[in-house]
C-alpha cells in the first residue's frame, strides 16, 4: 500500500483499506482491527514517540513521580484520543467482513498499562507497596472493561487482552497481583457481556501458562518463546483454546514462503488434535513481512494436506497486480 505505520494508526481510510486487503489476501478466520497497546496510554496522559515501521512507543509516564491512582473520570470514552477513528473502522469492518471473519478488539492489559502509567518503578512497587500496585491494577482493569464495552458496541466478536509484561514476572507474583483482576475481567466478558475473550502474552511466558488458564479466558495466544505443544497440554486441562506461534522474525520476516508453509504444516502435524487450536503469528507481525510469506502460512492452514504433499521448491503464485 505504501503507507507508514503512523498513517495506518491515525487515518481511518488507510486503516480500513489495509484491513480489507489483509482480509482478501489472507482469508483469516479471525482478524484484529488495531494492534496498538498505546491507545489507552495516550488517552491517560502518556507521551508517545511515533515511527514509520512500528506502532508508537510510550515516552513519558504521568505517574512516574507520584504514587497515585487516576480518577475513574479519566477512563477512555468513545470521543477520547484516537477512539473515534478506531471505533468507526471497527464498525466498517464488521459490516464488510463480519459474516465471514471473527473480529478481534485488542486492548492493553492491566499490567502493561500500569507500567505505561508508572514506568519501570512498577516492578519495585510490587515489593515496596503491594497495596498501591493492586489499586493501580484495579484502575487499569476498569479501563479494560471500559475499552471492552466500546469495542463490543462497535461489533467486535472477541476481546483480546494483550499484556506483554506478564512474561516478566513469576507465577507467584501473577497470582498475588493479576489473578484477581484478570479473573474478574474474563468473568465480566463471559457473564455480563456474553463475549469471547483471549489473553495475549509475549515473551517466554511458559511459567505463567497455567495461572493464566486459571483466570478463565476463552483462549490464550503465545509467541515463539513458548513450547506451544507443552502449553496446549496445559490449556487442554482447562478447556482453554491456544493460539500461536509462527516465529515473527526468523520465519515470517526473513524466511521464504516455503519456510512459512513448512513451519505451519509441521506444527499442525505435531498436534495430537486440532481442537482448541488457532494457528497465528507469535505476536504482532513486523511491518516488512513479505505478503507472500503470510499467504503461504494461510495456505498451509486452509489446504494442509495439499501443502504437505507439495514440492517445497515450488512456491504459491501471487498476483502482484492484486496487491494495492
Positions of the model-derived regions?
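Active-site-flanking structural segment that lines cofactor/substrate pockets
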Residues: 1-27, 31
